[in-house]
């Protein structure tokens, strides 16, 4: 506000492409080197805003399936969580009078505006109240499982609201895109829709996801469909072993990288009775040069005419004869 600093999101090392952590940085308006704030947290930050007194930077902080509102001194120091807990803050605004409001959602209610005060949050908008009146929403449960190599994997389970103790439910494995993004405590209409139709919904954050640190995100570097496959399968095993899911009534699907990982799933196992893959690629050689991720593909996999074996190895197309799952392909 005093014009002395600019706060911005620093994208990390270019060589790390989309896996690079996003840090909050400030730089003097007179020039010089930037200062990175809160980088020791090993979590992605975003949407920075300098406070009215010029002493702190407010920002959004991803952390293990949540998105919190945090602040850090402009001069550097410890990060303080202004709004924490099991919630997803997608927007915030600090007014000239220091009134702070956030756009917040939780698994069982869509986004609403709340005022931040000494007692916590006070909701000041009620846009969704009328729509939700008389509707039974399903609670969303967190779970953590061990993947094949022992890596802990977090996820979310949504059961039909009228079958919260139901067993042997038809179950859908949903896979998020990115891969560097996360399923979170935000309200997800899709989960509620499927649950209302009688399905249990399993949504894990496999390696490659954000919110769990740089090493966790980069663990799938040039190794797609391997560790992340094990991770989502561990989530499916969890709901089967706990008699939540019917192993003979399983579906899987995702969009973008979620579709790509779905492609790996159906080439590696026949345990799903149906699959939907959307906005994905299957033959990376033929896809080369056709999308806006050219630099990222080359940085991670190399040039296809120089590293052809890897491009073929990672392309689900070359394993298509192993697919037995009925699959809907959406573009």
PLM feature segments, named:
Residues 1-6, 48-56, 92-99, 147:
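Blade-terminus and WD-like Trp-Asp/Gly-His loop motifs, strongest in beta-propeller folds
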